[in-house]
Amino acid sequence: MTKLPKVDVVGVGLNATDTLIPVPHYPALGSKVEFHSANVLPGGQVASAVVACQQWGLRTRYVGKVGDDPAASIHRAEFDRLGVEAHLITAPGCASQQAFILVDDAGERTVLWKRDHRLTLRPEELQREWITDSRALHVDGHDTAAAVAAADWARAAGIPVIADLDELYPGIEALLPNLDYLITSRDIPGRLVGEQDLRKSLPALRNRYGCRLTAATLGQEGVLAWDGAQFQYTPAFRVETTDTTGAGDIFHAGFILWTPARMAACTSA
C-alpha cells in the first residue's frame, strides 16, 4: 500500500450540494416571492471548512460520502481543482445530500435540506491512515459512529481533535470525551449540562469531558471560549453581509489555523 502524504488537517463529516436562491425577503406564509437567481455549489459543514483551510495554505484531506449522481461529480471535480485529497465513498443508487438555501437581502439564510440514510458514513468505511497521517482532525459528529472511530484513532496518535457541533446527534456522548477543542452553537452547552449561562456551562462542559477548550459561537455577537484558566471573548467583524451561508464553517477553518497542529506545521515547513 502506498503511504499517504501527511496533511495538516483531515476532515470527516458532511458535504452537501447547495442551491443558493437569493430573495428580496423571506416569503410570508401563503405568499409568492420572485427570486433573483439559483446557483448550484458544493458545500457542507466539514467539506467547506476543509476547502477554506486548503485555500489558506494548509495541506488537507476530506473523508465523506456521496451518492452516485451528478452532484457527486461536482464535489469530486471541485476537490480536485482545489487540491484537496478527497476520499469520497459512494452510496449506490442514492442521491447526494442536497440543500436549498434562501438568502434574503440582509444576507441571512434559511436552509432546507435532505439526506438519504444510505449516506451515513460507517466506521468500517474509514481507513486508519486517513486519520493518523495528519496533524489535526476536524469532525461535525453527524455520522457519530464514524466520528468516534476517527477521534479514537487521532487521540491514540496524539493528534488534536476539533469538533463543530450544532446538534446533539444520537450517540454523541461517545464522541465528546475524545475532543480537544469543542466548539458548539450557542444552545448546545446548556442542553448538555443543564445550565443556560455560558459562563457556567462552558467550564462545566470542559470539566465533564476533559476538553482543552470549549467555546460557543454567537452569530453576529462573536464567540465565547473557556480554556480552563480564563474566558476569551472575540466579537464578530462588522461587515456588509451578502450571504451568511457557511459563515460558521469558515470560522472553524480559521480556528484550525491556530491549533497546536498548525503551529507544528509552520515550524516544520
Enumerate the language-model features and the residues they cover.
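Glycine-rich phosphate/adenosyl-contacting loop at the front of the ribokinase-like
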Residues: 1-65, 72-74, 240-242
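Active-site-proximal loop->helix
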Residues: 70-82, 101-102, 107, 175
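Conserved phosphate-binding/catalytic region of the ribokinase-like
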Residues: 1-8, 34, 198-269
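Conserved phosphate/ATP/ADP-binding segment of small-molecule kinases
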Residues: 151-233, 240
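A glycine-rich helix N-cap at a beta->alpha junction
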Residues: 78-93
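Conserved phosphate-binding/catalytic loop of the ribokinase/pfkB sugar-kinase fold
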Residues: 87-91, 101-141
